[in-house]
Amino acid sequence: DSIGRGLYTENEIKLINNMANCYIRAERHYDAIDILKPLLHYLQTKLKNIPPNRAQIPMVAFNYARELEIVKRFDDAIEIAEYARRICIDYGVYTSLSGILMILAECYYHQGNREKSVELYHQAYYLFKIIEDEDNLAIIKTEAKKFLGLELN
């Protein structure tokens, strides 16, 4: 509740996000959501005159969407992930984009939209490949095979 009451520096925003990450690692997903939701709202409202990439929005939105997906709030996760995807593209900030695409692929899979899921898995796979993220390449290959029987090469 108190997250939106002040003005924060970039480091303080990262610190609040890291607090949410502690809850994530402890598998306390609802506690993480309780931090990430007001933090994202704060970033969207208080820092609206700062470019979203500078305001840490893609990073916070990625974590928030991932947590929403974990607690099976797929519609909400898609809404947040699509918002983050758009910011990444509009502002040329691609650090979180491959992970955001993977979240979208997973959510659409769980909603039964195989076609959209396959398209997004391919997009995420190639971005992971471009940036040589071997760990996430292995994860996405396994996941696409398990969920969709999809071979990514």
Model-based region annotation:
Residues 1-4, 37-48, 82-89, 123-133:
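Amphipathic alpha-helical segments of tetratricopeptide repeats
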Residues 7-8, 52-53, 92-93, 113, ...:
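Short coil/turn linker motifs that delimit alpha-helical repeat modules in TPR/alpha-solenoid proteins
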Residues 14, 52-59, 99, 119, ...:
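Residue register of alpha-helical TPR repeats
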